[in-house]
Amino acid sequence: MQKRVVILLLDSFGIGASEDARDFGDLGANTLGNIAKACFNNLADSNDRNGALKLPYLESLGLGLSALKAANELPLGFESKPNLIGAYAYAQELSSAKDTISGHWEMMGAPVLFEWGYFKDKKNSFPKEILDEIMRKTKIKGYLGNCHASGTEIIKDLGEKHLETLYPIFYTSADSVFQIAAHEEKFGLDNLYTLCEEAFHILEPLKIARVIARPFIGANREDFKRTANRKDYAIKPHKKLLFEKFIEEKQGEVISIGKIADIYAHVGITQKFKAGSLMELCDVTLEQVKNAKNNSLIFTNFVHFDSDYGHRRDISGYANALEYFDARLKEVLENLRENDLLILCADHGCDPSFKGTDHTREYIPVLFYHKDLQPAFLGKSESFADIGQSIAYFLGLSPLDYGKNLLNFKGQS
């Protein structure tokens, strides 16, 4: 029987500080719980939303119950006995990190059991010899930034100087990343991509996970804004991914929506669809759910929860986006085929109520829906790789090296 898998990954949607959160300075972080608390207390009201957080379709898949198991506390405003149609778990990350790459790789069978390279200094973050080599290889005359920064704030602070000099803006964060911002029209998108590609090759020996192109437009600090033409240059995964097994063993299609292909360095991806906004990501996902052939894996990363609301520490915006997503989830559920497996999960936390602007080390929800899947609690996963192993089981693939299968269908013992 031909099967499909649909993975909807809500980037940064953690559900409570993990057991090792103290090691990351993240004790007390709870992305969902703290958003729900703010909403319940009318602290996230805006022109777009008000009152308690309303996520009926996510609740029906087990989100609230998963959060209860992870944090020992039901999110405020959630039902203790929802009309459950899905099976749910929560997962601890095996990789010793809280970044996008580590979380995504682990769930597809390649946990990061080595240390990424990081730029830890808040100012003068990058080694001079690296900067000199980038300048020599790319012929740029100078650069701005060279610090830890919020991506939206640094273009406000340095965007006008960038337009005067055409020096690219280099910055980083607590993640293993080197980001380059430049004006899409004045500096040129192709020039930015070429610069990022060269920087990626220079930084690869340092095990920097990603170089990210961050194009923006606008004429001054009041109207600078990032565009949808972000591009990630990522190190290739070190182990065979679930995607590759699916292609080799079942001749499957692996459909990337959003930044998925970039995260996996395009390994094992057969079709790619970009989208610039949360609405567009939902639209493209729904289109693929309706039209993708059987024997397909559809994987969407909903990046805006992280980039627009988590890092920006925008509780109300995050809540509004979650409620919008939940309404669109109804459409996905209505268009699933007879033998589709739907999975909702996250890659790390990014609590908008927490100190700083970085990711937070949290448990993630793991929610499954299939017509023959018993609605039940599936336990705590000790690795995100349980997601990939469960998919491998469902698709009839050979086992991955990491993770355990969580699925038990009706009629099975």
Regions found by a protein language model. Give the residues of each.
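Feature captures the catalytic ectodomains and active-site-proximal regions of enzymes
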Residues: M1-S413
